[in-house]
Each structure stands twice: as structure tokens, then as C-alpha cells.
Amino acid sequence: TTLVSNTLLFAISNFSSKLLSFFIRPYLSYALDSPDVMGVSSLLQQATNLLIPVVSLGVAYAIIRFGLDKENDKASVFVNGAATIGLGFLVLLLAMPLVSLIPNAAEYLPFLYLCVLASCLRTLCTQFIRSRMLNRLVAIDGVLTTLSLLLYYLLFLSVLRMGATGFLLANALADLTSMVFVFFAGGCWRYCKPKRFDRGLWREMLRYCLPMIPASISFWI
């Protein structure tokens, strides 16, 4: 019965997410009414997607791999993942002069950085609950994220008419909404124990995930 209920829940989740996504695409074409604004938004989205695997060092793969291993301490896996993202984001901050060279990025740099950080943190939490086999929560989060993204688009693009800035802000807040929901609903907060940082495990996780970065980047090229 658990398998049937989980399968049904994932089917509903996938259908709902795809249905909402079906409305989002034409809505964006309408809301981002200027070709220039749409082009800038698309370029910034691609830049975000390229920066995410670099900033996170592909640690999402390691969280699943080492989180599923019952011999590993769950808190250590979570803290190691958070430390990796923190380190990567610090490097990104130091590289701000280089990132600002991306076409059209300088004007939107704070929002671009917010998007990258929000996405990395959301992935940290969602991959961690996947490693704990909280499949129902994963399915619920998928619908919540898509729905919140649509609502944020309506607010920032139709009501406030913020253009490319609103586009980035909507994506960042949708990821943050998902992250906060999963962090508390999935009990991730119970694993926030900095003293459980495991340097040996961290090296193993990096050896596993670093080779994944080129593949993640090539997906968006």
C-alpha cells in the first residue's frame, strides 16, 4: 500500500507541476513584454544555471550518495554539504568583478547572487530529504515550488512590473520558500550541528562530486 500511495502521490505531483508549468511559459511571454527584457531574463537564467554547479561544487550528488549510506552520520553529511556551499559562495563573492563581466549581469548582480544561493540551499535540503527517503515530502515540495513560483511571477511581473529584476527575484523567493518548507517539515534543522563536520567524510564527498561538475555545466551549454 505504501508503494501504491507513493506512486499515486508522485503522479499527482508530476501532473500538477507540469500543468502549472504549462501556464507559466506563455505567461512569461506575456509578462516580459519587451524582447529585450525577455532576452536579458533568459541570459541571466542561463548564467545562474551555469554558476550553481560551480558554487555548490556538485555536492548535491554527494549528499544523495553518502546520505543513503547507513554507515555515515546524517548530521555530518548535511553539515558537510552546507559547508561546501558556504565555501563556494564565498569564492563567488570574491569573484564578483569577474562575474560582473557577464553581459547584462552587473546591473542585476545582487539578484543573480541571491538566485544562486537560494537554489543551492534548496537543493541541499531537498537532496537531503531524498537521502532519508521522505518521498511524500519531495512530491509535495515539487507542487509547492511550482505554485509559489507562479504566484511570485504574478506579484513581481504583473502587479509590480519589475521586469528582469522581478524574474530573478521570483525564482529566488520560490527556491527560498521551498527551502524553508523542507528545512522545517523535513526536520533538517535537527541535523544543523556544526560540531559534526567530518573532514575525512568531506574529502570523500568532494572526490565523488567534483568530477560531476563538468557534466552539470555541459547540460546548460
Predicted features along the sequence, with ranges:
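Residue-level recognition of transmembrane alpha-helices
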Residues: 10, 14, 42-45, 81, ...
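Signature of the first transmembrane helix
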Residues: 2-60, 115, 150, 210-221
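Interhelical loop/hinge segments that connect adjacent transmembrane helices in multipass membrane
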Residues: 1-3, 110, 140, 160, ...
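Membrane-interface junctions at transmembrane-helix termini in multi-pass inner-membrane proteins
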Residues: 66-69, 119-143
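Membrane-water interface segments that mark the loop-to-transmembrane alpha-helix transition
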Residues: 5-17, 43-100
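C-terminal transmembrane helix end/exit motif
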Residues: 63, 126-131, 135, 157, ...
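Alpha-helical transmembrane segments of multi-pass membrane proteins
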Residues: 50-54, 89, 94, 101-128, ...
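Membrane-interface helix-loop junctions in multi-pass transport and translocation proteins
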Residues: 29-39, 103-109, 133-137, 146-180
